[in-house]
């Protein structure tokens, strides 16, 4: 399931409900976390 953080975003640990946190759980394809919509 795609991350709600944004496109190009991958969940490090997918929850059973298929949701992820836009934090350390959010990994971007690039080096910019803002690309995933992460605040950090």
From Swiss-Prot:
Changing residue 40 to K: In allele MtnA-3 and strain: AF6, Highgrove, Indiana, LA20, Taiwan, ZH18, ZH21, ZH27, ZS11, ZS30 and ZS56. GO terms for molecular function: metal ion binding. The keyword Lyase does not apply. The keyword Metal-binding applies. Keywords: Cadmium, Copper, Mercury, Metal-binding, Zinc. Transmembrane segments: none annotated. It comes from the Eukaryota. GO terms for biological process: cellular detoxification of metal ion; response to metal ion. Induction: Strongly induced by cadmium, copper and mercury. Belongs to the metallothionein superfamily. Type 5 family. This protein binds cations of several transition elements. It is thought to be involved in detoxification processes. All cysteine residues are arranged in C-X-C groups. These are thought to be the metal-binding sites in other metallothioneins. This is Metallothionein-1. The lineage of its organism: Eukaryota, Metazoa, Ecdysozoa, Arthropoda, Hexapoda.
């Amino acid at each position: 399931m795609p991350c709600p953080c944004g496109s190009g975003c991958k969940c490090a640990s997918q929850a059973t409900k298929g949701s992820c946190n836009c934090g350390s759980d959010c990994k971007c394809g690039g080096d910019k976390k803002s690309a995933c919509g992460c605040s950090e």
